[in-house]
């Protein structure tokens, strides 16, 4: 199944599919809707890296990173900003694919770690991120716990498909 997954740029042709993605109801307070993420990306184009996750011809998720190498807070040098997997597509490895793809992009950019922040507690994504190698740092951004995952910078990867 994972071989069918790919990341695509958000375009005029697929923006409606992006905005139609909905997480489970118990997750709605934990991650911003895709439309909000796209507004953030529009206002911060120099750092935002938004991508739709496709399985075949169907949009099944959305991932957005921030790459801000000059930011005073190193968390934002390579940061998993948003991850929205459609409710009916969760538990199928799509989130893992998105995070691993983002790690590849971060490594291609020469980064040594990927950061994420999340709401901890019931229904929160902490367990998911820990299974992917993220460890809490003890820091918080607003009311979200920060976790990091080490990555190894690699030679340039062909990211033209992303």
Placement of each model-derived feature along the sequence:
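Conserved acetyl-CoA-binding loop of GNAT-fold acetyltransferases
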Residues: 129-139
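Well-formed, non-transmembrane alpha-helical positions, independent of function
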Residues: 17, 127-128
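Active-site acidic-Proline motif in GNAT/NAT acetyltransferases
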Residues: 86-88, 92, 120-121
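Short, charged/polar, Gly/Pro-enriched secondary-structure boundary elements
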Residues: 153-160
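Acetyl-CoA-dependent GNAT
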Residues: 3-81, 86, 101, 105, ...
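Conserved GNAT acetyl-CoA-binding A-motif
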Residues: 106-118
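Conserved beta-strand-loop-alpha-helix junction that forms the acyl-donor binding cleft
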Residues: 116-126, 142-144
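Conserved acetyl-CoA-binding loop-helix of GNAT-fold acetyltransferases
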Residues: 91-104, 130-131
């Amino acid at each position: 199944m994972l071989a069918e997954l790919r990341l695509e740029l958000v375009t005029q042709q697929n923006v409606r599919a992006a905005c139609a993605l909905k997480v489970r109801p118990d997750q709605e307070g934990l991650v911003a809707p895709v439309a909000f993420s796209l507004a953030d990306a529009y206002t911060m184009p120099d750092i935002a890296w938004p991508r739709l996750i496709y399985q075949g011809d169907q949009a099944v998720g959305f991932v957005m990173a921030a790459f801000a190498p000059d930011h005073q807070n190193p968390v934002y040098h390579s940061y998993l900003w948003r991850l929205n997997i459609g409710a009916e597509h969760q538990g199928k490895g799509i989130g893992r694919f998105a995070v691993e793809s983002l790690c590849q992009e971060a490594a291609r950019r020469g980064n040594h770690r990927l950061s994420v922040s999340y709401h901890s507690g019931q229904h929160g994504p902490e367990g998911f991120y820990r299974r992917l190698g993220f460890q809490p740092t003890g820091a918080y951004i607003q009311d979200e716990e920060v976790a990091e995952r080490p990555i190894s910078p690699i030679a340039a990867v062909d990211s033209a498909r992303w």
